[in-house]
């Protein structure tokens, strides 16, 4: 698994600064996550039969946080390695580096999946075909 990008994918835990009034979770760019967020979006209203994502990004890094409900995230590196993460606490997330295939699924009815991205949206940096992704990964691996 030399240079496997999925090995760089990791769970992150955020500070819960709450008190008797409730919870307050803080996520600061460049401190709690390894980039300054340029884009924020969220996914909700998906049920447990829906699969979202199904792409890799050439230039964007992400942190995904289920701020409500739960979901699962499968990451793949194009070299046969994969890992599944369960997101079910609003103070934990998953960091996903560039060029990692991601699929989000098994959404609970109340799921709100918050996504922080390191770049502004650019449709050209998305790889939406898995075979094309595997080819790009293998080409990059052959240069090492």
Regions found by a protein language model. Name each.
Residues 89-93, 99-106:
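Well-ordered alpha/beta subsegment
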């Amino acid at each position: 698994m030399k240079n496997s990008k999925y090995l760089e994918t990791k769970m992150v835990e955020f500070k819960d600064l709450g008190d008797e009034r409730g919870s307050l979770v803080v996520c600061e760019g460049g401190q709690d996550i390894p980039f300054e967020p340029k884009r924020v979006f969220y996914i909700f209203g998906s049920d447990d039969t829906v699969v979202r994502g199904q792409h890799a990004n050439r230039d964007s890094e992400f942190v995904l946080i289920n701020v409500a409900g739960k979901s699962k995230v499968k990451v793949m590196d194009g070299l046969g390695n994969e890992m599944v993460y369960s997101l079910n606490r609003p103070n934990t997330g998953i960091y996903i580096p560039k060029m990692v295939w991601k699929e989000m699924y098994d959404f609970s009815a109340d799921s709100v999946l918050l996504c922080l991205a390191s770049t502004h949206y650019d449709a050209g940096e998305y790889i939406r075909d898995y075979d094309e992704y595997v080819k790009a990964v293998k080409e990059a691996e052959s240069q090492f």
